[in-house]
């Protein structure tokens, strides 16, 4: 019987989960993202030293476990706070350990790791303890030409008690060779070692430039291949992005991809101060992948840029609602003049239903113009939606924003729009626990809460389900640029 034998993993990706019918869309999104994010090499500026000896020497009496539920060992450390600050301020970095640092060299004006990944500088975040071999190698990198940044202080001690005096003496001898001026900078061979209290000042001295898009609240991952630079960009703000965005990389042309749909096209770009700017439209919840070509001009079709909306066509009227798939029983179909959560229907079967309902409405549209893109906006959807227009499948939406281009499917006059909405299985699980059904029966690895307490969904609130709207069709004029 449903839901079958379930392991206590956080997500049940199997055919008994109602949302499983639309999981392929999510899988395709992940595939497209990973295909890019696993290509090439990291393209970050800073190597951030992980001062593990500070953690071990000052860790307290309890075990320091690497667990997702207890991240304080890094979140509350100086290194963790520095990492968060760098992310929030648009500075790119990768962590590096002592062993990895020992395999790092300076070559062609850059720090180069064992994997031949290139960085501009090394940052040591307030480390008190350091292996003397590591310190000696850091000084050697500076002597070869590297710029090394120490936040707040140089290390003052070596970890552990084995040969303590010998190792401490070697550390002191290495540090005494450094002579710092009034700007807390020491020349070391061809390079520099700089001590500073503020990260902004340190990065300015090392000529490390932040990504300007962080000023707009955009998050990003940057990669580099032999031919181009990749940006994965996410808008996790509540604001629409509709403007020129500067990137901290040179470029002659750029291509954009929506990893949710796979659509690609040239993106409008221009060069400014030896860097590239792109015209980016990104709604809250959306992601894009940019491919920047530093020296190559790419030809092709441009990604459509939507102009200013002059009217919105609300889809008001009568919605025919039919429950088409799921359980434990299909609720009775109904007619809605106003969209609402299906748990508010008078049919009690809807309270425990997990599955899909089909919403259908007829709408008359005005004469279409060639320069207009028609966007169907579903408003609030709980939780995924399959869209069909005039009996033609358009696409599946599984995340915000629940909007889709229907320009190629609608026609002048009357159109039939169908939206199949699938909810989560939570309400059905809730009902099983209310009834006391013994569905948790996996031997020795049963369903538990996040903190490994007995799992009980009987006190859960009903989860909103269905198409909540408001639903509208929006005709957007296209914005044209001189390069197109």
What role is predicted for each listed range?
Residues 229, 359, 372-374:
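Structural beta-strand segments of beta-rich domains
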Residues 246, 352, 363-390, 397, ...:
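Aromatic-lined ligand-binding clefts that engage carbohydrates, nucleic acids, or primary amines
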Residues 268-271, 394-398:
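Short beta-strand segments within Ig-like beta-sandwich modules, predominantly Fibronectin type-III
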Residues 277-280, 403-409:
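Exposed aromatic-hydrophobic patches
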Residues 287-288, 374, 411-437:
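Short, well-structured beta-strand segments enriched in hydrophobic/aromatic residues
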Residues 296-317, 424-473:
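Glycine/proline-rich low-complexity spacer/linker segments in large multi-domain proteins
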């Amino acid at each position: 019987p449903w839901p079958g034998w379930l392991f206590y993993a956080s997500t049940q990706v199997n055919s008994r989960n109602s949302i499983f019918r639309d999981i392929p869309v999510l899988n395709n999104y992940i595939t497209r993202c990973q295909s890019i994010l696993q290509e090439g090499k990291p393209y970050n500026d800073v190597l951030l030293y992980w001062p593990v000896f500070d953690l071990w020497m000052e860790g307290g009496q309890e075990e320091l476990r690497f667990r997702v539920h207890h991240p304080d060992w890094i979140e509350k450390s100086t290194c963790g706070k520095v990492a968060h600050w760098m992310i929030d301020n648009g500075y790119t970095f990768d962590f590096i350990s002592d062993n990895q640092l020992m395999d790092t060299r300076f070559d062609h004006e850059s720090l180069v790791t064992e994997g031949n990944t290139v960085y501009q500088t090394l940052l040591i975040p307030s480390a008190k303890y350091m292996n003397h071999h590591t310190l000696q190698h850091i000084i050697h990198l500076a002597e070869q030409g590297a710029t090394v940044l120490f936040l707040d202080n140089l290390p003052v001690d070596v970890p552990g008690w084995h040969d303590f005096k010998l190792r401490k003496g070697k550390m002191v001898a290495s540090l005494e060779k450094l002579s710092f001026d009034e700007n807390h900078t020491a020349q070391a061979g061809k390079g520099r070692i700089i001590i500073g209290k503020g990260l902004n000042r340190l990065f300015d001295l090392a000529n490390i430039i932040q990504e300007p898009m962080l000023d707009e609240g955009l998050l990003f991952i940057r990669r580099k291949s032999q031919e181009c630079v990749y940006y994965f960009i996410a808008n996790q703000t509540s604001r629409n992005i509709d403007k020129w965005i500067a990137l901290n990389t040179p470029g002659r042309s750029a291509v954009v991809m929506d990893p949710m749909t796979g659509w690609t096209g040239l993106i409008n770009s221009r060069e400014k101060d030896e860097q590239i700017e792109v015209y980016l439209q990104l709604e809250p919840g959306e992601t894009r992948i940019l491919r920047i070509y530093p020296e190559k001009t790419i030809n092709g079709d441009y990604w459509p840029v939507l102009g200013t909306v002059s009217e919105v066509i609300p889809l008001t009227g009568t919605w025919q609602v039919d429950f088409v798939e799921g359980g434990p029983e299909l609720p009775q179909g109904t007619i809605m003049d106003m969209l609402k959560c299906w748990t508010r229907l008078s049919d009690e079967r809807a309270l425990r239903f997990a599955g899909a309902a089909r919403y259908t409405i007829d709408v008359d549209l005005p004469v279409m113009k060639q320069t207009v893109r028609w966007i169907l906006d579903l408003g609030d959807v709980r939780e995924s939606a399959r869209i069909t227009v005039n009996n033609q499948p358009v696409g599946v939406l599984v995340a915000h924003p629940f909007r889709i281009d229907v320009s190629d499917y609608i026609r002048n006059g009357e159109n039939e729009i169908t939206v199949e909405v699938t909810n989560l299985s939570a309400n059905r699980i809730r009902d099983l626990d209310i009834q006391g059904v013994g569905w948790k029966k996996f031997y020795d690895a049963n369903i538990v809460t996040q903190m490994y307490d007995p799992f009980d969904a009987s006190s859960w609130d009903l989860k909103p389900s269905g198409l909540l709207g408001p639903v509208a069709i929006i005709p957007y004029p296209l914005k044209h640029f001189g390069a197109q």
